[in-house]
């Protein structure tokens, strides 16, 4: 267990150094930030004797429904489940706590986590409101796939972007459900224009899947399950090292890596080291020569080959001397 990983995105390269110990996969956590604790416990539980597990391992996909208050998160679950399991009213924040709702669809069971939504800091006056924010983050932590519900009549707000950022930093599968689509006047360009606005605002997660829905009419809600299945498949996909390096060789041949002061970046090979999200380590001659634009180019080539729709991809650069 590697503690003090307070920023997963920045510190993961350091975590992977612990592979050199040869005693298994390092588990990153932050005791202070309460990050990664669930994953650590999951690993511990895997080693419990089988006869002590009465219910077995819970492999049901966990879906966090998140968004700012009163965008229709609970209404979406109610429509999908077919009953009022979560009390809803038009007053923002009537869902006070995270509630797990199991749903069976086409023979597969899903667990939906509904939350009270994130509040603007200026409106937080009680500890209860602060607690609901913590629960939103906790729901994202527990989830395999995050469904961010936004209001079609408002577009992506600053708060929506903040919630999306939380899910992105934690490498969760991402679906954006644009609710209240029935309230929008439409022409043949409406979906395209809304899609472009959303992608421009959330440019840090171009991989996110979009779905235009209406909790009021039920429009397209039945497509959510297929989209969830697709995103989970992307999150757990493993690519053989040999296949990855065929793509890498072709990509390098088409566009040379960057150089600086006469020294060119060399990528010796790459391998996938993790899922949820899919994480790749690239062994290079000099990390200082790597550039995010070239990493994005490699990422795009991998996505062209395998899709990886709805999930972030992580890339770690590690130096390796040529003689090695």
Range-by-range predicted roles:
Residues 5-9, 32-36, 92-94, 117-119, ...:
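Conserved nucleotide-binding/hydrolysis micro-motifs of P-loop NTPases
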Residues 5-62, 173-175, 182-242, 312-314:
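Canonical P-loop GTPase G-domain recognition
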Residues 17-20, 43-145:
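Conserved G1/Walker A P-loop phosphate-binding module
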Residues 64, 227-232, 236-290, 296:
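Long, well-ordered amphipathic alpha-helical subdomains in the mid-to-C-terminal portions
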Residues 86, 118-132, 182-190, 236-237, ...:
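Flexible beta-alpha connector loops of hexameric P-loop NTPases
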